């Protein structure tokens, strides 16, 4: 978005096919490594008897609540990784939008109005999505609620993607 708005004439040169592939594959590789780490750790944990997972889908926090052993290290790992990925992602988007905002403020009044009307919905959708994800993954265990997390999970897995074509 930054390149398309701030330097539209350089977009096709800077966004090579190789870079586009890297930008798509990179998050998938990082997500796979993150998931495999937590999944491998979960296979090593002792579970007591038959249990039912209550949430909308099987997530790490509800799964850890079914373990018979101490899961503080696992919960800490989930918290640290989710926090680091979240902070890095949000900072990247925030810095990008600061540069975009500075470029928009240098435009003429007419161009500024058109750009704001075109681009303002994307940061809204991004920050709603990141806000719900932070709420789920980066919350103290004292405030953890399976029922509330189920509602928030439905929101960020179904509601936000459903409205994304209309917002963006």
From Swiss-Prot:
Gene3D superfamilies in UniProt: Rhodopsin 7-helix transmembrane proteins
The UniProt entry, under PROSITE patterns, shows: G_PROTEIN_RECEP_F1_2 (PS50262)
> Which GO terms label this protein's molecular function in UniProt?
G protein-coupled receptor activity; olfactory receptor activity
Q: Which UniProt keywords apply?
A: Cell membrane, G-protein coupled receptor, Membrane, Olfaction, Receptor, Sensory transduction, Transducer, Transmembrane, Transmembrane helix
Q: Which residues lie on this side of the membrane: Cytoplasmic?
A: 1-18, 68-75, 147-168
Subcellular localization is given as: Cell membrane
GO annotation, cellular component aspect: plasma membrane
Residue stretches spanning the membrane: 19-39, 47-67, 76-96, 126-146
How does the protein's chain sit in the membrane according to the entry?
A: Multi-pass membrane protein
Q: Please indicate the ranges of residues that lie on the Extracellular side.
A: 40-46, 97-125
* Role played: Odorant receptor.
Q: Which family does it belong to?
A: Belongs to the G-protein coupled receptor 1 family.
Protein name stated in the entry? Olfactory receptor-like protein HbT3
Originating organism: Apis mellifera ligustica (Common honeybee)
